[in-house]
Amino acid sequence: MGLEKSLILLPLLVLVFGWVQPSLGKETSAQKFERQHMDSTGSSSSPTYCNQMMKRRNMTQGYCKPVNTFVHKPLANVQAVCSQKNVTCKNGNSNCYKSHSALPITDCRLKGNSKYPNCDYQTNQLQKHIIVACEGSPFVPVHFDASV
């Protein structure tokens, strides 16, 4: 009798772990935003900042992400942008918000002659307003739309 129960339970456990396990390693849109765009430790004047950060934040795996922006403020400051000026996103959606003030950012752009796996980025330190798309409950940034 015990063997019959274990033969029934084993396939059920396999099914449950098959459903649960993939979701455990999947990051949310908000977590992805934080990984790709937040660096509150402050900007670096190093010309290799973008090369280091793009690699460290897994944006050079399989291909070189062409453009990325890092914001050098605490996450709470960037989350607060979601309650600031509502603007239209580049894709036409209406869930974008523009910061009231310019923020310290680093703009990373793939150099023209750079090819995977040797991703080489131009690092530019700037002070600009940011535009982010926000979603969810709590309402948080999920996409970096632009800097202006």
From Swiss-Prot:
Coiled coil: none annotated. Substrate binds at residues 32, 35, 65-69, 90, 109. Disulfide bonds join 50-108, 64-119, 82-134, 89-96. Residues 1-25 form the signal peptide. The active site is at residues 37, 143. It comes from the Eukaryota. Keywords: Disulfide bond, Endonuclease, Glycoprotein, Hydrolase, Lyase, Nuclease, Secreted, Signal. The keyword Hydrolase applies. GO terms for molecular function: lyase activity; nucleic acid binding; ribonuclease A activity. SUPFAM superfamilies: RNase A-like. Gene3D superfamilies: Ribonuclease A-like domain (3.10.130.10). It is found in: Secreted. One of its GO terms (biological process) is defense response to Gram-positive bacterium. It is an enzyme of class 4 (lyase). Glycans are attached at residues 58, 86. The keyword Methyltransferase does not apply. Monomer. Interacts with and forms tight 1:1 complexes with RNH1. Dimerization of two such complexes may occur. Interaction with RNH1 inhibits this protein. PANTHER family: RIBONUCLEASE, RIBONUCLEASE PANCREATIC. This is Ribonuclease pancreatic. The lineage of its organism: Eukaryota, Metazoa, Chordata, Craniata, Vertebrata. The gene is RNASE1.
